């Protein structure tokens, strides 16, 4: 099972939007996954395989052992689908 987090800077609002888009993309891959949300300050205490976040926050996550995937536009389903498929393929 792949442990995945959607991370935003201030709380759960934008990460909930990203989580919804990620769920669509992950379901299309057929991967076995667990998807949660976190804010940037709390992610370092989580065990994760993949972290999806914005470019601004990705710079703060250099110390994570998880692979960080940058999403430029949380509303762009195609970008999320493509980057999710690429990230999940690394676990196959």
Where do the PLM segments sit?
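Short glycine-rich, flexible loops that bind phosphorylated cofactors or substrates
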Residues: 13, 59-60
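Short, hydrophobic beta-strand segments that form beta-sheet elements in well-ordered domains
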Residues: 35-36, 48-54
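Short, structured coil segments at secondary-structure junctions
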Residues: 46-47, 64-65
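Ser/Thr/Gly-rich flexible loops in soluble cytosolic domains mediating phosphotransfer, phosphorylation
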Residues: 2, 67-92
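Structural alpha-helical scaffold elements that stabilize or flank donor/cofactor-binding regions
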Residues: 42-44
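Conserved active-site segments centered on acidic
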Residues: 2-39
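Short, polar loop motifs at secondary-structure junctions
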Residues: 40, 53-59
């Amino acid at each position: 099972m792949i442990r995945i987090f959607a991370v935003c800077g201030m709380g759960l609002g934008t990460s909930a939007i990203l989580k919804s888009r990620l769920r669509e993309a992950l379901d299309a891959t057929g991967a076995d996954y667990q998807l949660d949300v976190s804010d940037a300050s709390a992610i370092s205490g989580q065990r994760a395989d993949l972290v999806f976040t914005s470019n601004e926050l990705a710079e703060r996550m250099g110390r994570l052992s998880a692979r960080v995937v940058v999403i430029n536009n949380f509303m762009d389903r195609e970008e999320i689908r493509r980057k999710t498929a690429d990230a999940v393929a690394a676990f196959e």
